[in-house]
Curated annotation (Swiss-Prot):
GO terms for cellular component: extracellular region; nematocyst. Belongs to the phospholipase A2 family. Binds 1 Ca(2+) ion per subunit. Its main location: secreted. It comes from Bunodosoma caissarum. The lineage of its organism: Eukaryota, Metazoa, Cnidaria, Anthozoa, Hexacorallia. This is Phospholipase A2. Its cofactor is Ca(2+).
């Protein structure tokens, strides 16, 4: 399974977000990870 940093849904291997707009508790960090995943 995916390993995601606690408090985020996008930082780590894969993501656990239900959709693109879902970020988790640490929104600024998750936003950066989500943008990086899209590269």
């Amino acid at each position: 399974g995916a390993t995601i940093m606690p408090g985020t849904l996008w930082c780590g291997k894969g993501n656990s977000a239900a959709d693109y707009l879902q970020l988790g508790v640490w929104k600024d960090t998750a936003h950066c990870c989500r943008d990086h995943d899209g590269c």
